[in-house]
């Protein structure tokens, strides 16, 4: 069988859905230990299920849901999101500003690919959700982690953020504000 080598883009990507932490968890599970799998973002095994009214709506709409919707997401859902955020004081948002995806992974990846050019630096909090670092790296960015200290209720260390900003860190328009 022919073997395919992995892309060099993966050299600096560590995302523990399939990495060493996952392998260790599988080993411990095989040994009889109960493992809480919090690495995949799947809330259903922990009792977080869709409310009945949403399930009823899904079932009712199945006959007309066989195909793609607008690439930004369902108009009615985007409109509801705009309304919600307008009640929270975000007045300038419109339906055209809202994108809905198939979960946070798709949207994080899409955002990083849209915003980063090869060699751009991006500030990401540490500790972080590994997908941010992986998506930024695969999009050609260089991740610069800033500290969030547990002893300070996980608030970001502003001095550390400022120390990490370089000419490659922020787009020119954003850099003017720092």
Question: What kind of region is each of these model predictions?
Answer:
Residues 2-4, 11-103, 110:
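N-terminal small-domain helix-loop-helix segment of the aminotransferase-like
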Residues 6-8, 176-177:
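Short glycine/proline- and acidic residue-enriched helix-loop micro-motifs
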Residues 65-178:
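Conserved core of the PLP fold type I
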């Amino acid at each position: 069988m022919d073997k395919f080598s992995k892309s060099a883009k993966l050299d600096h990507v560590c995302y523990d859905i399939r990495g060493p932490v996952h392998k260790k968890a599988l080993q411990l599970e095989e040994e009889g230990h109960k493992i809480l799998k919090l690495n995949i973002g799947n809330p259903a095994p922990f009792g977080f299920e869709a409310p009945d009214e949403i399930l009823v709506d899904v079932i009712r709409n199945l006959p007309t849901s066989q195909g793609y919707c607008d690439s930004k997401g369902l108009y009615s859902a985007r409109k509801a999101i705009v309304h919600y955020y307008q009640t929270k004081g975000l007045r300038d948002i419109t339906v055209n500003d809202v994108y809905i995806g198939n979960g946070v992974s798709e949207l994080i990846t899409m955002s990083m690919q849209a915003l980063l050019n090869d060699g751009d630096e991006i500030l990401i909090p540490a500790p972080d959700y590994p997908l941010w670092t992986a998506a930024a790296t695969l999009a050609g960015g260089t991740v610069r982690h800033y500290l969030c200290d547990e002893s300070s209720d996980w608030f970001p260390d502003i001095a550390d953020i400022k120390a990490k900003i370089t000419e490659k860190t922020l787009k020119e328009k954003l850099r003017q504000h720092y």
